[in-house]
A protein has these predicted regions:
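Acidic/histidine-enriched, glycine/proline-rich intrinsically disordered or flexible terminal extensions
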Residues: 147-164
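A short coil-to-beta-strand element that immediately follows conserved catalytic motifs
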Residues: 69-78
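Active-site-adjacent beta-strand/loop module that shapes the phosphate/pyrophosphate-binding cleft
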Residues: 83-113
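Acidic, metal-coordinating catalytic segment for phosphate/diphosphate chemistry
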Residues: 1-21, 27, 91-92
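NUDIX/MutT-family hydrolases
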Residues: 103, 115-150
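A generic structural micro-feature
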Residues: 14-16, 90-98, 118-123
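Conserved Nudix-box catalytic region and its N-terminal flanking loop in Nudix hydrolases
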Residues: 29-65
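Conserved hydrophobic "DFG−1" position in protein kinase catalytic cores
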Residues: 24-25, 32, 104, 128
Length: 164
């Protein structure tokens, strides 16, 4: 049996989920992922595995999800998020998710083709989403921050604990 090395652990009644995201942009669009189960888009990326750095993890996730190697341009955002969701046992619980979002260098010969599936086997789809979309995207700060990229790393807190 394969060992699960994902840095996602139960903590009391909640979950700590440490992840990375790839910021892949082109012509005022960002490459996002969607699936048939959820009604929102999410960033290319996933959980850091134990023993990986965030940089190693984002490169691995890009390779797994896109079937393509990309180099990192820079760390764009560190985001601490608290939200309610389901992971693993499908029971809704509070999730604390520190995430590192990296701007990637998009090669000239990059072609869009999704290579991944969800844990339940359903496919994921890649789509270029306009920065100013009305669609629901996570992380939400992509809608405001990607229009005006900075060379500095930004720290963001997204706290949805009071939403429930």
């Amino acid at each position: 049996m394969a060992e699960n090395k994902d840095m996602c652990v139960r903590c009391g009644e909640g979950v700590i989920n440490i992840r990375v995201g790839a910021i892949i942009t082109k012509d005022n669009h960002v490459l996002m992922v969607r699936n048939n189960r959820d009604n929102y888009f999410y960033s290319v990326g996933g959980r850091i595995q134990f023993g990986e750095t965030a940089e190693q993890a984002v490169k691995r996730e890009v390779r797994e999800e896109l079937g393509f190697e990309m180099e990192i341009d820079r760390l764009g955002f560190i985001c601490e998020a608290y939200f309610y969701g389901t992971i693993g046992d499908k029971q809704e619980r509070l999730i604390y998710e520190p995430a590192f979002y990296f701007y990637m260098i998009v090669p000239d010969d990059f072609e869009l083709e999704s290579k991944t599936f969800l844990e339940d086997g359903s496919p994921e789809y890649l789509e270029w989403v306009p920065f100013d979309t009305e669609k629901t995207v996570y992380p939400e700060f992509f809608k405001t921050e990607l229009n005006n990229p900075s060379r500095e790393t930004k720290y963001i807190v997204a706290d949805e604990r009071s939403v429930k």
